[in-house]
Structure formats: structure tokens, C-alpha cells
Amino acid sequence: MAESLFKKILVPVDFSPCSEEAFRVALTMARTFQTKIVLLHVIDTSALATFNQLGLLAVPSDAQGQKRRLRHHARLNVRRLLESESAEGVAVTRVVLEGAPFTEIAKTARTEKVDLVVMGSYGGRSGSLDKIFFGSTAEKVVRTAGCPVLTVPLPPKSRRS
């Protein structure tokens, strides 16, 4: 039997429809190549710090409470993805980290020694100003991951015109 092209696939998710589509694509690939998946969610602490500085949190000193709520929300959403019928029979390791998403995704790709990153083409923060000044997370991951990156758009029926 030939050696599998991919042994381990990293799938970063922000729970947007596009990232959940990337997870579905990765599950199909995992079945095809008998591959393990690392499912990663990064709590964007840089955004939290900015919200705190701008006074956008209900209580500015409640950043720790907000992080706790975001971790809880992440665990619930990861569980929801893993309990889906399409995830049955695939070996999935879940990881929740804090930091700048593209940095943590690239670090995880290296530390987990993944062969491929499968991620949504765009996520929850797809505002045009953010992209103009900072570039998209997917674009930064393509430049820094150190392995191939497959970006997955929404399926045609889900795309907005």
C-alpha cells in the first residue's frame, strides 16, 4: 500500500460558515487519506485588548471573564462540530489557544508537524478595512505556515451575491 500523501491536517476554525465548510472538506480528505485532524480554534486576544482599550467591553476590567466566556463558547462549538454525523470515524484532536489567529495557526502547523492546513477563505472578521490594512488571516497563514495551505470558499449555494 502506498504511503498516504497527508498524515495530519490542521483545520483552524472560527465557527463561521466558511470555516465549518473547510472542516467538512478536511473530514472528507481525512477519510480518503486515512489522516488525523487537528481542529484548532484561536481566541483572538489582540481583538479583546483593542476592545478593552476602546471601552467596547461592558466592563473594561472584565477581560478575564470575557476570555473565560469565549473559551466556554469555543468548547461548545468544537463539541458541536465533533458530534456532527460527518465527523464520525475520523481521529480529531481539539486545541483551543489564545493569541493572534494567524500566528497561533502557523505555530501549531509547525509544532504539530502537519502536512496540510485546510481553512476557510474568509472568516468571521471579513471587513474590508481589516483586509486593506492587515490582510486576511488565510493570506498570512499561506505565507507563514511552512506547509501547503488549502483555502476553502463557501459552497456555491451558500455564497451571497
Go through each PLM region and give its residues.
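General small-molecule cofactor/ligand-binding pocket signal
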Residues: 38-40, 93-97, 150
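Glycine-rich, Arg-bearing micro-motifs that act as flexible, cationic patches
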Residues: 116-140, 158-159
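Small/aliphatic-rich secondary-structure junction motif
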Residues: 2-61
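A short acidic, glycine-rich active-site loop
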Residues: 59-76
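Short, hinge-like loop/turn segments at secondary-structure boundaries
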Residues: 54-58, 111-112, 135-136
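Short, flexible loop segments at boundaries between secondary-structure elements
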Residues: 147-159
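Structural beta-alpha unit
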Residues: 1-4, 80-117, 156-161
